[in-house]
Amino acid sequence: MIWMSVLAFMVSFIGCALLLRWARRSATSSYGYDKPQRFHMGEVPRLGGVPMYLGLAVSWGVGTWLSMRGDPSSLRMQLWVVVCLAAMLPAVVGGIIEDVSQRLSVRYRLLLTLLSAVLAVLLCGLTVPRLGWPWLEQALGPAMPWLGMGLAVLALTGLPHAFNIIDGYNGLAGMVATIICLALAHVALQVGDRTLAAMLVTLAAATCGFLVWNYPRGMMFAGDGGAYVWGLAIALASIALVQRNSAVSPWFPMLLLIYPVWETVFSIYRKLMRGMSPGMADALHFHQLIYRRMVRGVFDDDLARRMLRRNNRTSPYLWAFTLLTVVPALLFWSNTPVLVGFCLLFVVSYVVAYLAIVRFKLPGWMQNNG
C-alpha cells in the first residue's frame, strides 16, 4: 500500500511539473476573466485532473497486475479495479476538454458523468444494497435492488459536480477530498478491506502530488477534470465499501460527503428560487461568502499577491467545517441513527451560518473589517 501511494504521488507530482512547463508556452488552458468564480490573477492551467488520473491509473494498474501474479502485498486487487478506471474515463476526458477549451456545455458534461456512472454500475456491479432502515427495505421489497442501482447512478453522477462546485479556492476541494479519502480508508482497514483502503490512500497520495503545486502558490488548478476524478473515485469507493462490508452504515459516507452534497443541493434550490438555471455559475456559494465576509483583507501593494494570500486564507475555514463531519463519522461509522442525526445537524448549521453571513449577523470578531 505504501509503495502504491509513493508511485501515485510521484506520477501526479511529476505530471503537474511537466504540464506547468508546457503551459508556459500555451494559453489554451487559461480561465476567463469574466467568470464569476475567478478569484486569482494571471493565467493558471486547469489541468490538475490529468496527472491525478494518471497517478491513479499507474498505481491501481500496477497493483492489480501484481495481485494477479501472486499478490505479494496482500492487496487482493482484481480486474474490477481497472474496469473502474475505464468507467471513469468518459467523464474525466469531458472535464479535461472543458478545462482546455471552455466550450463543453454543462449539459454534455452532465451526460458524460451519467455515462461513467452507468458504466460503473453495469460493469462493476455497483449498487447501494441497503438504506440503514430494515423496515423500509422490507417495505420496498423487490423494488430495493432497482432503487439501489438508481442511488448508485445518482451518487456517481452527482458527486463529481459537487466537488466541482466547492473547488473555488487554492487547496479547498483537494484537501477536502484527501480528508474524506483517509477517513474512508481508515474504516476500510477497520473492516479488513485492504483493496479499498489501498485505492483510497493512493487517491489521497495523487491528490497530494497535485496539492504541492496548488496550495499555497496556486500554480495549477484541478479544473473540471480533477473534480471529476475526486467525485467519481470517492463515489465508487464509498458505494463499494458499503456493498462489500455489511457492518458499515450507508450513512457513513453520506456524513463524510455531506458538505459538497448539501452545497450542491442548496445551490440548486437557491438558483431556482431566484429564477436562474441550476447550471448557471454564480458567486454566492458558501466558500465565496466566507471569502468576502469573513476573511480579513491583506495589505500588499501587489494586487496578485494580495489576492493569492487572501485566497489561501479561505480554504482553512472549510477544512475545519469538513472535520466537523469527519470526526463523528469516524466515531459512529456503523450507527445509522447517530449518523443521520449528524447529517441533519450539519444541514441546519449550514443554513443558519449561510443566512447569518448573508444578513451580516456575524459577531464582530468574525467579520471582514479589512
Predicted features, each with a name:
Residues 249-252, 273-277, 334-344:
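Transmembrane helix-loop boundary segments of multi-pass membrane transporters
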Residues 1-262:
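"…together with the soluble PPM/PP2C metallo-phosphatase catalytic core" -> "…together
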Residues 87-102, 328-370:
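Alpha-helical transmembrane segments and their immediate juxtamembrane interface regions
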Residues 106, 171, 304-312:
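Internal alpha-helical transmembrane segments of multi-pass membrane proteins
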Residues 19, 262-277, 333, 353-361:
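Membrane-helix cytosolic exit motif
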Residues 309-330:
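Hydrophobic membrane-spanning alpha-helices of multi-pass integral membrane proteins
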Residues 19-45, 266-308:
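Cytosolic, membrane-interface loops and tails of multi-pass inner-membrane proteins
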Residues 13, 17, 57-58, 62, ...:
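A broadly tuned "polar low-complexity/structure-edge" signature
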